[in-house]
Regions:
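Acidic helix-start/capping segments at beta-turn-to-alpha-helix junctions
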Residues: 56, 70, 85-106, 194-199
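Catalytic zinc-binding patch centered on the HExxH motif and its immediate surroundings
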Residues: 22-27, 98-126
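Sec-dependent bacterial lipoprotein signal peptides
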Residues: 1-15
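An active-site-proximal "capping" alpha-helix that borders the catalytic cofactor pocket
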Residues: 79, 168-183
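Catalytic Zn2+-binding segment of zinc metalloproteases
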Residues: 152-167, 180-185
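Long, well-structured alpha-helical subdomains associated
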Residues: 186-243
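Short pre-active-site segment immediately N-terminal to the catalytic Zn-binding motif
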Residues: 129-146, 161-167
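Short, low-complexity, disordered segments immediately C-terminal to signal peptides
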Residues: 7-9, 18-45
């Protein structure tokens, strides 16, 4: 089977944000994710090693590369984790970006603007590109990795026994995102630089009133979300399952 994404970055120079792809290629899961409506084979295109995704910039092509990379490394981490536990892993399909209300419906419910979501009924992920753009221009590519890893966390919750799924499902998904990104970093797939959690907290606070994905009433405030993310980085998946 061909790899989901051939990553040829030796360095992805980032100013003010710190998610950096460094090496490796993703191993396809049992149900490989695909990004949006990209042509067949599009995910096999090598990534430009000169891309600089600094805060304040928003090149949609560059952001799309980061989205594919985030999908790839997150899928690879969870595929390996489930294999290590002797469990079957079913990767979610990735429908990718939409605008406004033109995203895929979930169990008959339409998509809403400013959101990213996992649909259990269809086992897929989707996100509003306006949400991605908002965080991308303020923090850089770390935002893209956070959003995708968080929604993937919901896909993981759907595959876990109920006793391991916290009542605080959104904060647990933030924790699982931290565990997955740190796990990917430990495997040499991605680099998380000091200060990323503070930058993520600042961005969560900045857009908290503007987007459904950052609505404090359902997801927790920036401080709670950052603490959950840090918990995943520090304690790994097992720590998240104790929430």
């Amino acid at each position: 089977m061909r790899p989901i994404l051939v990553v040829v970055l030796l360095a992805l120079a980032l100013t003010g944000c710190g998610i950096e792809i460094v090496s490796g290629s993703a191993t396809p899961a049992s149900s490989p994710p695909t990004v949006g409506s990209a042509p067949d084979g599009a995910s096999d295109v090598p990534v430009d090693s000169t891309i600089d995704a600094a805060p304040g910039a928003d090149d949609s092509d560059t952001r799309a590369v980061d989205e594919r990379s985030a999908v790839s490394i997150t899928d690879q981490f969870w595929s390996g984790w489930f294999a290590d536990q002797g469990l079957r892993y079913v990767a979610p399909t990735v429908e990718g970006g939409y605008t406004g209300t033109d995203g895929p419906s979930c169990a008959g419910e339409p998509s809403v603007p400013g959101n990213a979501y996992y649909c259990p009924a269809g086992n897929f992920l989707a996100w509003d590109e306006d949400l991605m753009r908002a965080g991308y221009t303020q923090i850089g590519d770390a935002w893209v990795y956070l959003v995708i890893a968080h929604e993937w966390g919901h896909a993981i919750q759907a595959q876990l026994p109920d006793r391991f799924v916290s009542r605080a499902v959104e904060l647990q998904a933030d924790c699982l995102a931290g565990a997955a990104l740190q796990g990917a970093a430990d495997q040499g797939l991605v680099r998380i630089e000091p200060g990323d959690d503070e930058e993520i907290a600042q961005t969560l606070q900045a857009v908290a009133d503007d987007y459904r994905w950052t609505d404090e009433s359902s997801h927790g405030n920036a401080r709670q979300r950052t603490a959950a993310f840090q918990g995943g980085v520090r304690d790994g998946v097992e720590g998240c399952l104790r929430l």
